């Protein structure tokens, strides 16, 4: 992340582009917010608080696509997301201004599971998104597609694989590519999910809770796809408890038309169907490859093992 030097005059000018009211900043300090953008808490004299992401103007599309995804999640109305207050460019920097929320890592996981199931009820007639966006700072392709198997192959796996093969260490994956892609097609050939609104980067670091316990989600990489992909990623790095999964499975079953008894049984099931487990391994390879492409060879052995497992599933 390139160094930038932002001060109160800069943020004053930035906020004057967003608001028509007088701007008097009494506090401006960097805060944590990821490894791509510079993030700040800004406090005005009237005690208004804001969260601002900034970066060099060449990264404007990353923040524009985050804005677009947050707006879609907010419109769905299922889970709270930070309110979007403004985006634009100021003095050679792009920015995204959001409401400031006091967040905690613990809260109502039952509500999070239920609300995610409700969000996944917002559907499209095709897989994809209105624009390509980003997963981390890597490009995420989202061309509309009628077939889920085709979308997953062409828009998810192959772009990450081709990126990995350009890395001298990643070239070792080349021996798996043909068999792996064939295995992906086989696993998804008869799997026909309804395209659902997804968070797209739903790991434990992209959810939090208000003091009331209400869930909040952020940093999306949204598109319309298989809801199982969001759930799969929650299992890759952990951070979600049993209450989340029980609540999600119960609500998802009810929303799909199951009886209360059937929904309870789904929520209490101790083991996932084998096909679901296999798809979760397949779906998480996308994120494992992305982590290799972002952060390097520490993720290479995980990619190789998972790819080998997917190939074995279809033999």
What residue spans do the PLM features occupy?
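Canonical protein kinase catalytic loop motif
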Residues: 198, 203-204
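ATP-binding pocket architecture of kinase catalytic cores
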Residues: 29-150
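Active-site Asp-x-Gly
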Residues: 141-153, 162, 191-197, 209-288, ...
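ATP/Mg2+ or Mg2+-diphosphate-binding catalytic cores
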Residues: 59, 258-261, 291-315
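An alpha-helical support segment within catalytic cores of ATP-dependent transferases
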Residues: 7-21, 124-197, 210-212
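Conserved N-terminal boundary motif of the eukaryotic protein kinase catalytic domain
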Residues: 22-29
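Short acidic/polar mixed-charge low-complexity motifs
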Residues: 22, 46-50, 214
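A general structural signal marking secondary-structure boundaries and capping sites
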Residues: 22, 77, 88, 120-127, ...
């Amino acid at each position: 992340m390139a160094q930038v030097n932002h001060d109160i005059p800069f943020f004053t000018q930035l906020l004057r582009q967003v608001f028509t009211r007088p701007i008097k900043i009494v506090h401006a300090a960097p805060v944590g917010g990821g490894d791509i953008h510079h993030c700040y808490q800004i406090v005005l004299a009237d005690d208004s608080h804001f969260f601002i992401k900034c970066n060099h103007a060449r990264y404007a599309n990353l923040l524009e696509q985050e804005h677009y995804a947050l707006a879609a999640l907010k419109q769905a109305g299922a889970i709270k997301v930070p309110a979007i207050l403004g985006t634009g460019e100021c003095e050679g920097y792009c920015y995204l201004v959001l409401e400031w929320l006091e967040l905690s890592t613990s809260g109502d996981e039952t509500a999070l599971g239920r609300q995610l199931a409700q969000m996944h009820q917002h559907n499209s007639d095709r897989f994809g998104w209105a624009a390509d966006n980003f997963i981390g700072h890597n490009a995420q392709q989202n061309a509309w597609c009628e077939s889920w198997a085709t979308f997953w192959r062409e828009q998810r796996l192959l772009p990450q694989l081709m990126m990995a093969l350009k890395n001298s260490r990643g070239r070792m994956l080349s021996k798996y590519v043909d068999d792996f892609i064939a295995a992906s097609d086989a696993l998804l050939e008869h799997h026909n999910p309804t395209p659902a609104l997804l968070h797209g980067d739903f790991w434990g670091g992209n959810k939090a809770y208000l003091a009331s316990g209400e869930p909040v989600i952020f940093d999306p990489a949204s598109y319309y796809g298989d809801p199982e992909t969001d759930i799969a990623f929650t299992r890759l790095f952990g951070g979600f408890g049993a209450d989340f999964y029980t609540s999600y499975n119960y609500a998802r079953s009810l929303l799909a038309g199951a009886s209360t008894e059937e929904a309870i049984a789904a929520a209490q099931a101790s083991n996932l169907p084998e096909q679901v487990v296999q798809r979760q391994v397949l779906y998480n390879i996308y994120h494992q490859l992305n982590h290799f492409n972002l952060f390097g060879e520490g993720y290479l052995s995980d990619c190789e093992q998972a790819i080998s497992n997917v190939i074995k599933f279809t033999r």
